[in-house]
């Protein structure tokens, strides 16, 4: 049967020994080289690739923040036009302080999973900016910023407090007041009724209390939304600070202590409201500065309690269980 050779010549047979000699392939010309190999021979491309590889870590974070500029523009407008409280600036400042404190420890090789998540969230925030509510799109954008920061931070930094600060940087107090303000006022009024009933004749109707014949309304500032924000902000900041001295403190420790933070905030808001209502029911017409003094005193006590909860030394866990 004849043998057909496609594309390659048949092997040569030695006349003396009858052995089949391997066919030598012709040397490759530059046209046969892979495209990447040809690019690597271009000096300009190599120097450009080296400059990208040696770019400082802060430059990538700055580029990520620049890509999210529509979100920051919207946040600035919402904070400055009076439609929301500018407390989110504190959370952004805390994230900036965290990055600055670890500027010499930023990873030269970022964690690819978090970097991919940052890129995906950035694309999602850009694509949905005109299709989702502004607050939802901003949430995705700030999660992208947090994921990018986590990608470059040292592995020992807890992830959960960083994500928490990114959420708290949103201008969301007005939205929380709209959706959760009334339920919180009802819960606060009912808890205050239990405490006041020991000394006064109290009845509750919605978010209002009838104390000894005096109608006292638990208004929006008494809902505790701002105390909730400040409480969780304190928890995130103290957790990141505590971890500098207690390496066993991780994201799991932070999450397991969050319920205690919620309880402290709720108790503090109930105590503040009870003191103010008791003063009004007793005929003490407290001035505005007295209301503020009571509120700030209770807030300071709540934040101190949260700092104590988050600052407790964490038990040392096995390496496989740390996050």
Regions found by a protein language model. Give the residues of each.
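Hydrophobic N-terminal alpha-helices or hydrophobic patches in metabolic proteins across all domains
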Residues: 2-14, 18-323
